[in-house]
UniProtKB/Swiss-Prot annotation:
Disulfide bonds: none annotated. NCBIfam families: PRK00881.1, purH. It comes from the Bacteria. This is Bifunctional purine biosynthesis protein PurH. The keyword Transferase applies.
């Protein structure tokens, strides 16, 4: 058991500290402290020794050097059960420090400010704090280290009852090393970001556990949700069951797709694939257009809405079973409608804007693949008309909408659209011509005609068979990257069928 007789306290986050320090004083614990922490303690009538009085060495360099002293680190690292350590500490008059209460300069909070300057960031890099934390954590069998104000109450209870066991101290040791690792990762990441280096030679990733999930993709898989250091989720849950692993993936997909498309866009997601996308003058009309694409697959889906959900739209949504809705805003009337279906998960995120600097991370065996997210867009000026038949301005708008949809569909991806709504989606087929046929069949199965439709392909057509198939279905125009060794054959097929075809020069594979 660790007997707490002496504590060193030096914190930036002072929440809960006064009550905790008073408790330590009342239990006969001698407190050593520094700077602003010392002032707070004394202002509240708590006995404490200044660090420079303790070490006999003044704080120097504007407070940059306060605790980097053998009397501090000897007291933290000394193993009292080791006779040689004990003898040397007595010889040098180094008392044992049993408890360290330290949290670090607010580097992350500082660099999160848009106007932060380099010098301010540098001055918020803590040196002495991490050193004390690491020393105490290394010697956890004899020294307790606290880095989180939320832990003060538990330690008070333990000191008052069963005491501090080695096992308990070990749990705080793990938390302490995670704290310093996270701190260093934040510093490293920020400086790399300032340099413009997207893919550094050494990648430090720090994530904070936000919540434990009920299970993973399947009930036999454990799962949790973690947030990266520099990003705080602004998803606001309004009602519904706890989010599952699969729910979170689908909500994220619905947000990504909706955020990159025009106002009043609605997309319906099932297993990470869109089964309907549309935009209109209002979200209700867009929802109706998106749902008609594949109403069977929309059953049990997640709906993303770049706009406001009112009572009328909520009523339309609840006519069928859905897992959840993510939108910019829900009116009070909408919430009253949804309250009658309390299991429907509602997420509000007012800033429906994609973070365009996010990276795409994918673990593989013994490694991690990282790439830029596929956010690059094209304009009408990037289109190259390759057929004899030329597109009208309306055709260009329809083709651009189709192109904006196909990038979100699993490869091989084909989508048939009107000017503002999907008609049929062919997703995830190993053969492109099969995706062409699937998309047409999906539309026909729900009574939608693809005659006069716009067709987007996420990658080039390797053979003319895809063109022949979509022409037979009645498509009017095609947008695709081009770049096949058989482009001439594909263009010839389009000309034979009197189709419009444009090349984008950009592929949108989605593995």
């Amino acid at each position: 058991m660790i007997q707490i007789k002496r504590a060193l306290i030096s914190v930036s986050d002072k929440s809960g500290l006064v009550e905790f320090a008073k408790f330590l004083n009342q239990n006969g614990v001698e407190i050593i402290s520094t700077g602003g922490t010392l002032k707070l303690l004394k202002d509240n009538g708590i006995a404490a020794i200044a660090i420079d009085d303790y070490t006999g060495f003044p704080e120097i360099l504007d407070g940059r050097v306060k605790t980097l002293h053998p009397k501090v680190h000897g007291g933290l690292l000394g193993v009292i059960s080791n006779p040689a350590h004990k003898q040397k500490m007595e010889e040098l008059k180094i008392p044992k420090i049993d408890l360290v209460v330290v949290n670090l300069y607010p580097f992350l909070k500082t660099v999160s400010k848009p106007e932060v300057q380099l010098e301010e960031a540098i001055e918020n890099i803590d040196i002495g704090g991490p050193s004390m934390i690491r020393s105490a954590a290394k010697n956890y069998k004899h020294t307790l280290v606290l880095t989180d104000p939320n832990d003060y109450k538990e330690i008070q209870n333990l000191i008052s009852s069963s005491g501090i066991s080695e096992e308990i101290s070990a749990s705080y040791m793990r938390k302490a090393f995670s704290h310093t690792a996270m701190y260093d990762a934040a510093i490293s990441s920020w400086f790399y970001k300032q340099s413009g280096e997207v893919f550094p030679d050494v990648l430090n990733l720090s994530f904070i556990k936000k919540q434990k999930l009920r299970y993973g993709e399947n009930p036999h898989q454990a799962a949790s949700f973690y947030e990266p250091l520099f990003t705080k989720s602004d998803f606001s849950p309004l009602q519904g069951k706890e989010l599952s692993f699969n729910n979170m993936l689908d909500f994220d997909a619905a947000f990504h797709i909706s955020s990159l498309l025009p106002e009043n866009t609605v997309c319906i997601i099932k297993h990470l694939n869109p089964c309907g996308i549309a935009y209109a003058d209002n979200p209700l009309e867009a929802f109706q257009l998106a749902r008609r694409t594949d109403p069977i697959s929309a059953f049990g889906g997640v709906i993303g809405i770049k706009g406001q959900v009112n009572g009328e739209l909520a009523t339309s949504i609840t006519e069928n079973f859905v897992e959840g809705v993510i939108a910019q805003k829900f009116t009070q009337e909408a919430l009253e409608v949804f309250s009658k279906k309390p299991n429907i998960r509602l997420i509000e995120i007012q800033d429906f804007k994609e973070a365009l600097d996010e990276l795409d991370l994918r673990p593989i065996h013994h490694g991690l693949l990282i790439q830029d997210r596929d956010y690059t867009t094209i304009t009408e000026k990037d289109l190259k008309v390759v057929t004899k038949k030329q597109p009208s301005p309306d055709d260009i708008r329809g083709l651009m909408f189709a192109w904006s949809c196909v990038r979100f569909i699993k490869s091989n991806a084909i989508v048939y659209t009107e000017e503002n709504a999907t008609l049929g989606i062919g997703a995830g087929q190993m053969s492109r011509v099969d995706s062409v046929q699937l998309g047409a069949n999906k539309a026909l199965n729900v009574g939608l005609s693809v005659v006069g439709s716009y067709v987007a392909s996420d990658a080039f057509f390797p053979f003319r068979d895809g063109i022949d198939t979509l022409a037979k279905a009645g498509a009017k125009a095609i947008i695709q990257p081009g770049g096949s060794v058989r482009d001439e054959e594909v263009i010839q097929a389009a000309d034979e069928h009197g189709l419009i075809m444009v090349f984008t020069g950009m592929r949108h594979f989605r593995h």
